[in-house]
Amino acid sequence: MKITRQKHAKKHLGFFRNNFGVREPYQILLDGTFCQAALRGRIQLREQLPRYLMGETQLCTTRCVLKELETLGKDLYGAKLIAQKCQVRNCPHFKNAVSGSECLLSMVEEGNPHHYFVATQDQNLSVKVKKKPGVPLMFIIQNTMVLDKPSPKTIAFVKAVESGQLVSVHEKESIKHLKEEQGLVKNTEQSRRKKRKKISGPNPLSCLKKKKKAPDTQSSASEKKRKRKRIRNRSNPKVLSEKQNAEGE
């Protein structure tokens, strides 16, 4: 039974390797349900996964999965310990965490460029993963790990590529790599370094001539009035007092 499982796994891996560029080390994205099933089945993932897939593997998860396991409490404490030992891959939900299934689904968008495997016991997530071409799916049944066969969506995609209707992501990457080797496509980083900041001319608004202010007639008139000198009476104070006394008599 074990030999037949490995034969099926080898066949499925060859399909994904030839058509989608899946290669070692195989990156296995685990969610909380898969970790819990491995714990109950006493499956040593780090030891048994490389033997089953016949190659080097990397156990991975996301922050959203870890956050979800923390919120679920003590019932999934063992699954959380397994997930914490995995490599954490960056997901687009750094500020606002989402559910583990939604997060893993977002990690395999746009043709699964990082060649992730999705390992889950969630049936709803499995159905959604099967609708995305080129995503290997793993699950645990009867305490044994299984690599699912390519989904009908994946097989239809490969047939469309073979007939020339579509171009796979793997082919796009290989074409781009060949162009870069032949110098047909310049490296974006080098082109950015070569770009220099253009010397900009002076601000046209600063070149305008300053308008002369018209003289303010009212202010000038008030200034003239203010400049008039006050005539002081410089007569002798004694004389003034005598005049005032005479007038009083």
Swiss-Prot record:
Any GO CC annotation of this UniProt entry: nucleolus
Pfam families documented for this protein: Fcf1 (PF04900), UTP23_sensor (PF24779)
CDD domains: PIN_Fcf1-Utp23-H (cd09866)
Protein name as annotated: rRNA-processing protein UTP23 homolog
Entry-annotated residues carrying Phosphoserine: S174
Compositionally biased intervals (Basic residues): 224-235
Biological process according to GO: endonucleolytic cleavage in 5'-ETS of tricistronic rRNA transcript (SSU-rRNA, 5.8S rRNA, LSU-rRNA)
Protein family: Belongs to the UTP23/FCF1 family. UTP23 subfamily.
Lineage: Eukaryota, Metazoa, Chordata, Craniata, Vertebrata
PANTHER family: RRNA-PROCESSING PROTEIN UTP23 HOMOLOG
Main function: Involved in rRNA-processing and ribosome biogenesis.
UniProt biased composition (Basic and acidic residues): 240-249
Region (Disordered): 180-249
Top-level taxon of origin: Eukaryota
GO terms of molecular function: mRNA 3'-UTR binding; mRNA 5'-UTR binding; RNA binding; small ribosomal subunit rRNA binding
InterPro entries for the chain: Fcf1/Utp23, PIN-like_dom_sf
Subcellular location: Nucleus, Nucleolus
SUPFAM superfamilies, A to Z: PIN domain-like
Keywords: Isopeptide bond, Nucleus, Phosphoprotein, Ribosome biogenesis, rRNA processing, Ubl conjugation
Record flagged with keyword Lipoprotein: no
Main location: nucleus
Entries under Gene3D superfamilies matching the protein: 5'-nuclease
Site of covalent link Glycyl lysine isopeptide (Lys-Gly) (interchain with G-Cter in SUMO2): K179
Keyword Methyltransferase annotated: no
